[in-house]
Amino acid sequence: MKNFIRIFAALLFCSGAHAQQVLRMGSIVAPASVQAQAMDRFADSVKKKNVGVDIRSFHGSQLGGGPDQVRNVQLGVQDMFMDGMTFLSDFSDDMRMAETPFTFASREHFEKWLQSASFKKIQEELIAKGNQRIINLGVSWRRGPMRVLVAKRPVLTLEEFGNLRLRAWQSEVITRFYGKPGLGATAIVIPLGDVYVGMRQGVVDAVTLPFDLVQPMKFHEVGSHIMLWDEYWQVLPMNISEKKWQALNDAQRRALTESVDEAGNWYNEQLAASVEKWKAELVKAGATIHNVNRAPFVQRIAERNRQWQKEGYWRAGLIDEIEKLR
């Protein structure tokens, strides 16, 4: 009997040793950003739970740009990635809606959609076509916690926006909605890490981004006008390879989902508590903060959304499903 117990214990030990999982998690943001710090807290929390998972962070586009890292996860050469939802739109036409500007009435409206049957279809498509899933739909990581437009001059009207050379990231959704077909700017695709130099050299006049990234990336040094316009309410999806997810046991999965929610709560608290401090620091550094009337922008996008839905840009009926959630 004692021999049986010793053998059984040895098998358990071997099983635990072989269950060790090392996950490579990437981002495109600066290591000093609140997002990167929160991701690192997530990794530390998982490690402390002692379930045999070691998450290693790679920030600042070390593993490539956003589209590259999403593709890495799809192919299984990278395990996890966290950034905007538009990077996932290749796998679901409906995902295009997630980061369209001036579509949702409020953050509450947007997050209600994330919990709806409509968004569940997107998760299913993401798994089937992208070989990855979002694991942090319990606690939304409220990026920013709002988005701003940083520019070399004030931009308060549609006409002024249409005269911009605006940095866009590598996404057809973004170039369509912010560019000439949508809000009217000239969209210039450059990596986020190149925007500072691009603005200094005149390649672009402006960049739209989460408020919490303005200071860490020093964009206020090259664009002294900051427009508060909430063009959309962004959340950060934590994507994991579906193959890797299926290889985890129940305890490991639970450790990941619990830890990502804990880190998400910390992230949200840090950002919410820092907004006024950041505004004051930016003004002290020479920036001017402007409020923007969203109504003309909302009207323009409402027209484009209906037009592009008729053309099959996303599933018929999607806009009506979203409107019913107001």
Could you tell me what each predicted segment is?
Residues 15-19:
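Sec/Tat signal peptide C-region and signal peptidase I cleavage site
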Residues 20-110, 118, 127-326:
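N-terminal secretory/targeting leader peptides
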Residues 2-10:
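Sec-dependent signal peptide recognition
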Residues 9-12, 57:
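Exposed boundary/loop context
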Residues 121-122:
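Core domains of carbohydrate- and sulfate-ester-processing enzymes
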